[in-house]
């Protein structure tokens, strides 16, 4: 009897292999472009360059301080947010989630409006007869901006760890009269300590690869990171060899940080509980006072820069700026790039997870992890490094394109894949556990399964992943900083041009439009599935 010929590659493996091959090939091409353009001279002299080591040391130092100042206060803020219920709590938690994807230049504009020499606090001190000596430039300004972005995110992640503590443990501790330090040590700390290392590693990596923040607030050669040095080598000195060497150093450092982050990221077993909603509010007076102070301080950190963007944007230049065709051209370019990059990111992420979950279901755990790791690999090549590789590759072959749309869209899509993976990974696994046997028994597979099962059950996670990818892309400045020009502007690039030419009032209007566009785009996309959508 004739046997049916088996395909060389199973159909369920093709999507993941295709996406992983594309991502790895792009990363490899960028790496080779950097390697070929790296200086071939005396490497000993390069490694003895004192300024190079100053840049490397400063990159690590500011990332370490940023992670420390973000994670330690987040522990106490997360406990306060868990214990207290107050009007606006859900809005505050939503704001904590939004700071990660807030355009960097918008936040920087707000921070300068509040903490700058002519800012709100300086005016307040002047009216009180005090001298305002804080400068938002240099290391202190970089740390302030990084804490603004990352402390809310760390608080949100640590709050999730506290919410995973079984209600029975909390109830038993309350019955035993366990309070204060003992409750934190024996009940909360075992759950927090498993979440703190991966959160700290993630924040360290994000701050180490920070570009727009350091570019705006660095304040000179003493506060320069590797990414900023790459940008300076290409944009000001046009020294591709030095840029390639710096990009290689950045890539090696980030790859080590990615591997460390993956090593520290251990899944927290949720366990089973019958009292998931039970909590002990700890209504002692000093506890309520401490929690209130922490929450108020968090609000004072988050709200003033955002309010400053809104207030400063509503100035007398508003009608004139809105009448400029350049603004609407930049807005349309940003929207076009963001939507295209978001869709491409979600498609590539679904392809990776589709095959990786099938590998896991067949007990091929190592292969499944390797496929997912290919999506995280792009974290080892920050946007400025990837863009540098593309810049050198195109410049040495076919020449730089007239329009950078394709490069920016593709790069932004790749940079958003790790975030989309985190959003879709667990829902995809849950669907496999719930519907895999049923689909096999009914013979539903491939496109039919995608249409009947995944696209229906994943409406909310898909919308959330698309929203994150689009807003991350619309606020990106690292990639467009290399390819942007007068004929190709995004809103962040246009805002940077306005700030650089000291058109602060025009820049305030642009920052307000960019802020409103991000919040509107995120909200609209996240609401696409509908309020009453069912995922069962």
Residue ranges, per PLM feature:
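Flexible interhelical linker loops that connect adjacent transmembrane helices
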Residues: 4, 263-294
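Membrane-water interface segments at the C-terminal ends of transmembrane alpha-helices
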Residues: 7-41, 50-163, 191-216, 245-262, ...
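Peri-membrane helix termini and adjoining interfacial loops of integral membrane proteins
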Residues: 34-45, 116-128, 218-227, 268-275, ...
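Short amphipathic alpha-helical coupling elements at transmembrane boundaries
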Residues: 45, 90-93, 126, 167-175, ...
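Short helix-to-coil transition segments within interhelical loops
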Residues: 163-192, 359, 437-458
